[in-house]
């Protein structure tokens, strides 16, 4: 499967990622490479392999719980289709 530039633009729009036309072909190549890897995975013979629900015995490494301000408010809000001050603006869904 190969993605054309129009599909890459649509994926970027749905993901709310702003891309320049100059970056479009590079992104198209990266996405096509990822899809190529997925196609390779589909060719792997998995007959007789039990499905894995989870790792079961894996544990997450504990870290100290530290409160931060995030320091990325402006970067996050730059992806919002509409904002009012430091908040996302969304359409009213409940009357």
UniProtKB/Swiss-Prot annotation:
Its EC number is 6.3.5.-. It comes from the Bacteria. It catalyses: L-glutamyl-tRNA(Gln) + L-glutamine + ATP + H2O = L-glutaminyl-tRNA(Gln) + L-glutamate + ADP + phosphate + H(+); L-aspartyl-tRNA(Asn) + L-glutamine + ATP + H2O = L-asparaginyl-tRNA(Asn) + L-glutamate + ADP + phosphate + 2 H(+). Keywords: ATP-binding, Ligase, Nucleotide-binding, Protein biosynthesis. InterPro entries: Asp/Glu-ADT_sf_sub_c, GatC. Disulfide bonds: none annotated. GO terms for molecular function: asparaginyl-tRNA synthase (glutamine-hydrolyzing) activity; ATP binding; glutaminyl-tRNA synthase (glutamine-hydrolyzing) activity. It is an enzyme of class 6 (ligase). One of its GO terms (biological process) is glutaminyl-tRNAGln biosynthesis via transamidation. The keyword Ligase applies. Heterotrimer of A, B and C subunits. Allows the formation of correctly charged Asn-tRNA(Asn) or Gln-tRNA(Gln) through the transamidation of misacylated Asp-tRNA(Asn) or Glu-tRNA(Gln) in organisms which lack either or both of asparaginyl-tRNA or glutaminyl-tRNA synthetases. The reaction takes place in the presence of glutamine and ATP through an activated phospho-Asp-tRNA(Asn) or phospho-Glu-tRNA(Gln). HAMAP family: GatC. Belongs to the GatC family. This is Aspartyl/glutamyl-tRNA(Asn/Gln) amidotransferase subunit C. The lineage of its organism: Bacteria, Pseudomonadati, Pseudomonadota, Alphaproteobacteria, Acetobacterales.
